[in-house]
Amino acid sequence: MVQIQFHQGEPLGHKKEKPPPVSPPSPPPIRRVTVITKDEDTLRSVQHFLWMVRLYGTVVFQTSATIATTILFMLIPWRVTAPYLRDTLPFWSTLLPCALRCHAYWLERRRRPGTLMLVMVYTTLTTISVSTIGLCFDRTVVIQAYVLSSMLCVWCTGLAWLMAWNMQRRLAILCLLSFMLPILWLFIAVQSWEPYQRIILALTVSFIYGLKIVLIRDTLTVLYRSPSNCYTDGDLLRTAMLLYMDQVIMFLLVVVPLTAPIWYPNYAGALGRTAHWLFHK
């Protein structure tokens, strides 16, 4: 006897579909919070301090090499006697350090590491450019320029440290820096000088003021260095080149007002004679 089986609720010959697998609900993402212990914070502070000591030690080495070479050039009895060459040589000597400063800033923006060979090339070229100042002017002028530029660099570094370590005085320092340039312009405007003398000194003061702001920014970059960055030798050498070039350009700009009694009359007379020769030929 044949037994016939019936499928209840489904037609014959139809395969039963399996329900789609249901995955269990995924747990919420775990937020990883990095907890910096006191020992790690102390270790990073010590590492940052040692990095800054090496940084400023490199800058002091570069500056000392430049000063020593300039003193050797000052001891040479020969001096540049041609008025036009003596008056314009410091200006041409400023162009090379400015170009090197722009290249160092380009390296900083691109995060390119500095090398020891690049530091030596920077120091050699800049030292040659600065040492020519010792062949153009008296020793007293060069010494005064070094002292005044060093005081300005130390003052800018001190302001940067105050802005970094004392948040309450930051607004006062910014206000002081904002009002300083108009006060200097007003001081130049009330002097009984020739118009070209006022224009040249106003431009020089503006460049020195802008360089002070740049030096403060570079110092703040050093002080606010992120702990996540590795303190490599390449970053140290690149930053040292920036600070060194700031100090050199500050010295070259300070030379202009200190040598004003020397080159203002001669240079103005030379320009007047050249203009008269060109327009009344």
Swiss-Prot record:
It is found in: Membrane. This is Uncharacterized protein HVLF6. It is a multi-pass membrane protein. The chain crosses the membrane at residues 58-78, 88-107, 117-137, 145-165, 171-191, 196-216, 248-268. Residues 20-30 have a biased composition (Pro residues). Disulfide bonds: none annotated. InterPro entries: Bax_inhibitor_1-related. It comes from Human cytomegalovirus (strain AD169). The gene is US12. Residues 11-30 are annotated as: Disordered. GO terms for cellular component: membrane. Belongs to the cytomegalovirus US12 family.
